[in-house]
């Protein structure tokens, strides 16, 4: 279904009726039960169908991804599912497509899956997750994603700095130092990152995007999938340089290398990638600050203490990179 309407305004004012209209456009029928789920970037709802099944409908934030970029994600999920990876591919909406449009907003429906988020994993769970990631990367390396970005310093440092400094989010007295340390990190990591082969990866594989069910891990939420180094999908699961983090990475890699070789030299990118994520995520909040749901969710974002703590963390990373 394609209708007229200003997409951004429609996105902020989605109603249950419009959600149900979107689900039913291809012939599916709903009971009327529609539950909003916690999500910041997109609007996500759980909808009950007449047959008792439940689907999760994601309305993509206008301007975030193009139609082609979302279909790149859907294609990757379809390939992973065909290779029997534990992922949740999108449903055909009954129109012959996995991507719909209503009021100018693109949307996708997924079958609901059940699982738990585990904050701590035992060694065997880490090895099992590592095997799953290795299999995912083996599929991801088979081809590219022409409409998805590459993980690089332009996207993760330079463009975010324009948003943060140009929008006045970093306090005036701190802004020059914040810019300098971010650029220092960018300068240290640009060439090593560019020299590392990029392939299709999840991109945001933190513990909250891994559900654990009876059959093991299920990888969910590929919204940030992009072209990048495989190590990006590992460091978020075992952050830092503590003994515990090192053991976690060792377990993940033990499982990973059952299915695929891993370039261990790229582990040196873990801390630089963490720095890139810090700057990128702050710019993400800044870009969404006019969304009514963001200020209450991030109340410290406009406080000087938030930025000083972030600056000090970036300094620690930069000093370790460029002593």
Place the predicted regions along the sequence by residue.
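A cross-family kinase active-site recognition segment
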Residues: 119-176, 196-198, 298
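ATP-binding pocket architecture of kinase catalytic cores
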Residues: 48-145
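Conserved NTP-binding catalytic cores of kinases and kinase-like/nucleotidyltransferase enzymes
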Residues: 1-92, 213-214, 321-323
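Active-site acidic catalytic loop and adjacent metal/ATP-binding pocket
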Residues: 41-57, 90-91, 186-234
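Activation segment
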Residues: 62, 115, 217, 225-227, ...
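Active-site activation/catalytic loop segments of kinase-like enzymes and analogous catalytic loops
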Residues: 230-261, 277-293
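All-alpha amphipathic helical-bundle segments outside canonical DNA-binding/catalytic cores
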Residues: 262-274
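ATP/Mg2+ or Mg2+-diphosphate-binding catalytic cores
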Residues: 4-7, 163, 168, 283-323
């Amino acid at each position: 279904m394609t209708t007229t309407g200003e997409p951004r305004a429609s996105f902020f004012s989605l109603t249950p009726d419009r959600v149900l209209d979107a689900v039913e456009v291809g012939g599916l029928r709903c009971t009327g039960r529609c539950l909003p789920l916690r999500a910041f970037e997109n609007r996500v709802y759980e909808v009950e169908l007449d047959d008792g099944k439940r689907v999760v409908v994601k309305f993509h934030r206008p301007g975030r991804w193009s139609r082609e970029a979302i279909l790149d994600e859907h294609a990757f999920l379809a390939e992973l599912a065909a290779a029997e990876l534990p992922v949740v591919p999108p449903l055909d909406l009954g129109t012959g497509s996995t991507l719909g449009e209503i009021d100018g907003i693109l949307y996708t429906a997924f079958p609901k899956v059940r699982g738990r988020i585990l904050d701590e994993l035992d060694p065997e769970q880490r090895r099992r997750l590592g095997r799953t990631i290795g299999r995912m990367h083996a599929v991801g390396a088979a081809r590219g994603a022409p409409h998805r970005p590459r993980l690089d310093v332009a996207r993760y440092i330079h463009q975010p700095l324009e948003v943060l400094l140009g929008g006045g989010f970093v306090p005036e007295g701190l802004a020059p130092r914040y810019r300098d340390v971010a650029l220092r990190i960018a300068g240290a990591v640009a060439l090593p990152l560019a020299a590392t082969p990029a392939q299709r990866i999840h991109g945001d594989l933190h513990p909250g995007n891994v559900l654990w069910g009876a059959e093991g891990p299920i990888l969910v939420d590929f919204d940030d999938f992009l072209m990048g180094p495989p190590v990006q999908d590992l460091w978020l699961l075992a952050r830092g340089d503590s003994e515990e983090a090192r053991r976690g990475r060792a377990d993940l890699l033990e499982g990973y290398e059952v299915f695929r070789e891993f370039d261990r030299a790229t582990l040196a990118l873990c801390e630089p990638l963490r720095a890139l994520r810090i700057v990128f995520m702050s710019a993400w909040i800044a870009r969404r600050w006019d969304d009514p749901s963001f200020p209450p969710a991030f109340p410290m974002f406009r406080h000087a203490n938030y930025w000083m703590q972030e600056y000090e963390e970036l300094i620690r990373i930069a000093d370790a990179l460029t002593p």
